[in-house]
Amino acid sequence: MLSVIILAAGKGTRMHSSLPKTLHTICGEPMLFYILETAFSISDDVHLILHHQQERIKEAVLKRFKGVIFHTQIVEKYSGTGGAIMQEDKTPIPTKHERVLILNADMPLITKDALTPLLESKNNAIGLLHLADPKGYGRVVLENHQVKKIVEEKDANDEEKEIKSVNAGVYGFERKFLERYLPKLHDQNAQKEYYLTDLIALGINENETIDAIFLEEEYFLGVNSQTERAKAEEIMLERLRKNAMDLGVVMQLPDSIYLEKGVSFKGECVLEQGVRLIGNCLIENACIKAYSVIEESQIVNSSVGPFAHARPKSVICNSHVGNFVETKNAKLQGAKAGHLSYLGDCEIGKNTNVGAGVITCNYDGKKKHQTIIGENVFIGSDSQLVAPINIGSNVLIGSGTTITKDIPSGSLSLSRAPQTNIENGYFKFFKKP
């Protein structure tokens, strides 16, 4: 086994946001959560180094993960990546295991499989990337698959600038290596920071073996700006779409479909173009038609859309919800709402038909109220159901009716002003003076 240390103390200034960088989301999940999941998949000893807005980050983590060991970086005294793993006396933070893997919290695309080459190394090791264009990165000079030195671009000569090997920002160390060299680390550089790369340089000077482990670039993209966050999200979306299609989900124009990590599919499902699936959703044997939005809801044996919006806590089973219908905290069981309706805080029974323009008036300005609709109910177009209201089964509601009282089963309900036709009214109205 090994211990994992995740570095998450930075300010994330380039994100230009009051939200801590590591809590910015990738497909609905804070990017820090991805790296924590990966860490717990390989270790029972996970450490998180914090400083900037640490209480906010800690609160978010504790809602989701158990067993994370939190540390506060002493940035006033020991800043930088090397300082992140130092205690007050410059010794490494205590870990359960002798092997220590160090990761950055802003790399949400890392997976267990992507780390395998680094995990298999028995020596102290640094993860490397081979970049076609390494401009802006420090170069890693190799000799017989071992790290000879790490040189910053501004200090590199012309030959070194041609090197394509750069630091991926992930490391595997033996604890005794950290104990030996961390106290020797210094901050005599332009940034006045302690760097893990300098730690490696100290080891090389003492003829320590440092393995160079090449990793796949896609998995080790660091997120330091909104542009990089968007790039990482697109890569994650590609993974989620592929996983869904591998399960048999039919996607029309996959690149136009957005889905989040909490979405699950069962049975035969179709997603038309422009669909957005947000939060923890279950889509089972269902067709989600073009440009519909499903949030924190369950769609089972049903068709939804096009241009429909199922807001949180909607459960739509054996039903049809058509274009421009919005549901919220609604339970539909075998019902139809073809178009242009708002169905909020309601339960609708089987074989019930909701006409165009029907609205459940669920909010009285202070509280939300529920509408209960039974089975075999026909609700005429442009009707308003003023909650709280209970409509029995086998009920017919005439078009344009405003319901303010419960309706017993078997009833016909009407409430409308009598129609008046005025003979020659048109001509009288438009008569010229």
UniProtKB/Swiss-Prot annotation:
Tree of life domain: Bacteria
Catalytic activity: alpha-D-glucosamine 1-phosphate + acetyl-CoA = N-acetyl-alpha-D-glucosamine 1-phosphate + CoA + H(+); N-acetyl-alpha-D-glucosamine 1-phosphate + UTP + H(+) = UDP-N-acetyl-alpha-D-glucosamine + diphosphate
Compartments in which it is found: Cytoplasm
EC number: 2.7.7.23, 2.3.1.157
One function term, GO molecular function aspect: magnesium ion binding
Class in the EC hierarchy, top level: transferase
Annotated segments matching region Pyrophosphorylase: 1-226
Stated role: Catalyzes the last two sequential reactions in the de novo biosynthetic pathway for UDP-N-acetylglucosamine (UDP-GlcNAc). The C-terminal domain catalyzes the transfer of acetyl group from acetyl coenzyme A to glucosamine-1-phosphate (GlcN-1-P) to produce N-acetylglucosamine-1-phosphate (GlcNAc-1-P), which is converted into UDP-GlcNAc by the transfer of uridine 5-monophosphate (from uridine 5-triphosphate), a reaction catalyzed by the N-terminal domain.
Matching HAMAP family: GlmU
Assembly, per entry: Homotrimer.
Record's protein name: Bifunctional protein GlmU
High-level lineage: Bacteria, Pseudomonadati, Campylobacterota, Epsilonproteobacteria, Campylobacterales
